């Protein structure tokens, strides 16, 4: 029996490693429409296969180097038990993250109070979503239709999307216009670009092909009745009072592109006290926004909350915190606020562990 288990174990492991190596070598020869599905599938298999093994080795090593001496009888009980827990528990957690966690949408309800908010906008409801990465859904429209229904039931005044509509390609958008056009808001829908929307993570036959792909992605927003803000702004009026909405192109620390032009986006709205900024990467807030502007509320995405972490009873942790200072939730510095969403889609690992896909409902409040 042990021999059969060993054979199956090593056959699966060697087969998985071989598949990864072959995919790496043959990647450029694969049709682009199949790459995302294959990469995500292998990514999920790799995580679910090697995480339990690594955890088992770590635990056994700790027991070994702690000089704790087991009797032969104890070893026959403890080691298999550790192996069982270290192997099966993470495996089932990962499987749940892939098949359930990635699509278990959660509504986060946030209030943002600010003294400069006009009285006419007191109670104004904003839906904030980000990082759809539509290619990852592999045209499973019904999965995202559930999110659309949840959003519409919240009856928001306005919807903001803060970038990463696709993974790389415009063809990922095929058929999604019928789904996303159903998103409804009382006073409008606005969007910006994220780093993945520029096609920088793919090889192109020519600069013209990349440019054409980029233009198709931008024009998609017309099909779903979203206004794409490219380093520009709009004003919203209620009862002769107004607030401003500005949106910038992607701005992140290297190696991410810095096409966002904050000064140009705010150029025509300096005299409007309450401004909302859409900026995909939250590092932009610390590097430019709070240094040079008086923007009341900035909305960002990008981090995904790493799609893995702990988020229980108001306490949250994720390894992504060691890369991004502002990685999920509401942050405030004096009179300026930043909200970073955990994202609605996924990229790479096809699942979410402890960081559910997020729909954010932000209610603006007038403060004294």
Predicted regions and their residues:
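Soluble catalytic domains of enzymes that build or remodel membrane lipids, polysaccharides, and related
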Residues: 118-368
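Short, well-ordered helical secondary-structure segments
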Residues: 29, 36, 87, 92-94, ...
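Non-catalytic terminal accessory segments
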Residues: 1-103
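Low-complexity, intrinsically disordered or weakly predicted helical/coil tracts enriched
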Residues: 70, 74, 106-112, 131
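Hydrophobic alpha-helical transmembrane segments in integral membrane proteins
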Residues: 91-116, 136-138, 142
């Amino acid at each position: 029996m042990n021999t059969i288990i060993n054979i199956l174990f090593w056959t699966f492991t060697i087969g998985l490693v071989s598949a990864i190596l072959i995919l790496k070598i043959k990647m450029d020869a694969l049709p682009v429409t199949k790459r995302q599905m294959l990469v995500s599938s292998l990514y999920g298999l790799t995580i679910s296969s090697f995480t339990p093994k690594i955890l088992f080795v770590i635990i056994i090593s700790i027991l070994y180097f702690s000089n704790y001496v087991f009797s032969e009888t104890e070893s026959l009980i403890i080691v298999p038990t550790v192996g069982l827990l270290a192997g099966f528990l993470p495996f089932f957690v990962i499987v749940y993250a892939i098949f359930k966690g990635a699509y278990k949408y959660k509504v986060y309800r946030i209030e943002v109070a600010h003294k400069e908010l006009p009285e006419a906008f007191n109670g104004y409801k904003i839906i904030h979503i980000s990082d759809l990465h539509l290619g990852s859904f592999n045209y499973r429209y019904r999965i995202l239709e559930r999110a659309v229904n949840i959003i519409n039931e919240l009856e928001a005044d306005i919807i903001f999307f803060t970038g990463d509509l696709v993974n790389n390609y415009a063809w990922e958008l095929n058929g999604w216009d019928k789904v996303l056009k159903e998103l409804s808001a009382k006073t409008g829908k606005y969007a910006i670009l994220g780093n993945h929307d520029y096609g920088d993570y793919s090889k192109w036959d020519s600069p013209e092909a990349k440019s054409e792909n980029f233009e198709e992605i931008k024009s998609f927003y017309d099909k779903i009745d979203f206004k794409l803000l490219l380093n520009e702004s709009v004003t919203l009026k209620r009862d002769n009072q107004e607030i401003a909405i500005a949106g910038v192109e992607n701005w992140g620390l290297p190696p991410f592109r810095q096409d966002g032009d904050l000064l140009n986006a705010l150029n025509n709205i300096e005299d409007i006290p309450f401004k909302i900024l859409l900026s995909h990467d939250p590092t932009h807030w610390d590097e430019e926004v709070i240094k040079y502007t008086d923007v009341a509320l900035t909305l960002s995405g990008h981090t995904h909350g790493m799609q893995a972490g702990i988020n229980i009873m108001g306490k949250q942790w994720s390894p992504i915190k060691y890369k991004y200072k502002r990685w999920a939730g509401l942050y405030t510095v004096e009179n300026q606020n930043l909200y970073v969403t955990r994202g609605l889609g996924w990229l790479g690992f096809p699942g979410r562990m402890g960081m559910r896909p997020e729909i954010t409902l932000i209610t603006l409040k007038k403060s004294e």
